[in-house]
């Protein structure tokens, strides 16, 4: 079972699921891959929590709350990963480039692999 942590944006998760189905077509429905999409759209803003202002991505924020924001996003991502792990997924895919900023911290806290886009592409 593939675990997909989506919702960052929702369309990216749906697009990934669509491509997964197209690229792994079976002759009958039962041959398609098994997956769970958790569309966790309530994850706080990722760019802001790593010190990037969304109005101008080249301007770093000097906000002293960035560590707090970082940890809020980490907690929310971890909740999603734990839910997928609990539901017997063999690995997790997160179709959001920015979410991979938390990859190392997430991977330390769960027992199944997370596929890291930035290291696989």
Predicted segments, located by residue:
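Non-catalytic structural scaffold of enzyme domains
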Residues: 1-121
């Amino acid at each position: 079972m593939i675990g997909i942590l989506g919702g960052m944006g929702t369309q990216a998760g749906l697009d990934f699921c669509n491509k997964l189905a197209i690229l792994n077509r079976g002759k009958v429905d039962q041959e398609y891959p098994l997956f769970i999409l958790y569309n966790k759209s309530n994850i706080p803003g990722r760019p802001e929590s790593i010190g990037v202002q969304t109005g101008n991505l080249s301007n770093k924020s000097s906000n002293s709350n960035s560590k707090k924001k970082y940890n809020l996003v980490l907690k929310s991502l971890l909740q999603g990963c734990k839910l997928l792990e609990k539901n017997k997924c063999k690995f997790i895919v997160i179709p959001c480039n920015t979410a991979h900023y938390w990859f190392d911290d997430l991977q330390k806290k769960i027992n199944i692999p997370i596929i890291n886009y930035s290291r696989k592409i």
